[in-house]
């Protein structure tokens, strides 16, 4: 067990009637806030989930006027893009999103789950769900729409090391090239919602990415407003505008190109039903690597050592025209560290 001695700091603030003011407590003003060699928060399977506690209060006239306390974790999230060329002279290039937490490359395994809406979930049930997912060696959960989970939801994810990426807008309500492409119509209200979500949730270490929308895209005005808002409120996490796109970007959303490649996809059928093995071999040929697939369905990818044990050709050169494809080094690209990251940022 680790223990940090309590740190107490005080800052005088003048606030007029009806006035709003942002008050910052920084290590430049308070050196004791600079913690050396802190106990870190890690994803499930990569280390401990150390959490620390903070109490904030605003005192006026010798009495507490407002107060808030919460747990937080200390961790660093970096991202990269794994670039791979596949297929002979006219090689196609695929990019897979890579996450590093506290310098460790994380093999993301998980799926989608939505917090129940308008249902009264007990705290015990929420914690039990998180615990069962952690025991299944899951470490990343994503939302498909714009959920507003309870604090208990995120506290359970913080406790069990479940990473989460948070989606701002509703899936398939703003499809480029259709009558819904300008939804939502009230962009100011949409941005207020984004700001509220970020301010409410951003202290949770389990959140590793902010995502604009799942599988579709907002129009250019809302796209830029959202991007600017995220940048102004959080510089510690990557922002991904969409998890996947299936339309003509040049014709319909050329503004998306400044954020490509996103490194995520769910191109093609999500494979929720049973199919003969030949179907999956053909699917890999059609859409190539899909190194970071945000929606997959039933199949799952084993760990690196397991792949090497039951696929003897797993270290052969990747080639879509080979009779053993995809039972070659493509199998290992999902799980093995690569020096070919074309992007790595904090």
Each model region followed by its residue ranges:
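Compositionally biased regions
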Residues: 15, 278-279, 339
């Amino acid at each position: 067990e680790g223990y940090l001695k309590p740190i107490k700091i005080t800052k005088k603030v003048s606030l007029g009637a009806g006035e709003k003011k942002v008050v910052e407590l920084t290590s430049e003003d308070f050196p004791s806030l600079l913690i050396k060699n802190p106990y870190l928060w890690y994803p499930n399977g990569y280390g401990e989930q150390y959490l620390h506690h903070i109490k904030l209060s605003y005192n006026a006239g010798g009495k507490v006027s407002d107060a808030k306390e919460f747990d937080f974790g200390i961790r660093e999230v970096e991202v990269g893009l794994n670039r791979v060329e596949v297929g002979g002279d006219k090689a196609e290039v695929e990019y897979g999103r890579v996450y590093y937490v506290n310098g460790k490359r994380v093999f993301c395994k998980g799926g989608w789950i939505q917090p129940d809406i308008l249902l009264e979930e007990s705290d015990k049930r929420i914690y039990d769900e998180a615990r069962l997912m952690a025991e299944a060696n899951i470490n990343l959960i994503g939302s498909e729409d714009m959920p507003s989970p309870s604090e208990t939801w995120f506290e359970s994810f913080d406790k069990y090391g479940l990473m989460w990426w948070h989606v701002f807008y509703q899936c398939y309500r703003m499809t480029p090239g259709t009558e819904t492409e300008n939804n939502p119509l009230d962009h100011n209200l949409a941005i207020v919602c984004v700001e509220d979500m970020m301010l409410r949730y951003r202290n949770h270490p389990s959140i590793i990415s902010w995502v604009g929308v799942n599988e579709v895209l907002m129009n250019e005005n809302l796209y830029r407003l959202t991007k600017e808002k995220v940048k102004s409120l959080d510089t510690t996490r990557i922002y991904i505008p969409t998890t996947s796109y299936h339309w003509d970007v040049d014709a319909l959303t050329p503004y998306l190109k400044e954020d490509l490649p996103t490194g995520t996809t769910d191109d093609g059928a999500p494979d929720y039903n049973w199919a003969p093995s030949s179907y999956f071999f053909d699917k890999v040929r059609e859409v190539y690597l899909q190194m970071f697939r945000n929606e997959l369905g039933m199949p799952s990818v084993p760990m690196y050592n397991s792949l090497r044990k039951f696929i003897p050709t797993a270290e052969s050169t990747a080639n879509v025209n080979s009779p053993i494809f995809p039972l070659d080094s493509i199998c290992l690209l999902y799980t093995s560290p690569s020096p070919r990251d074309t992007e790595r940022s904090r």
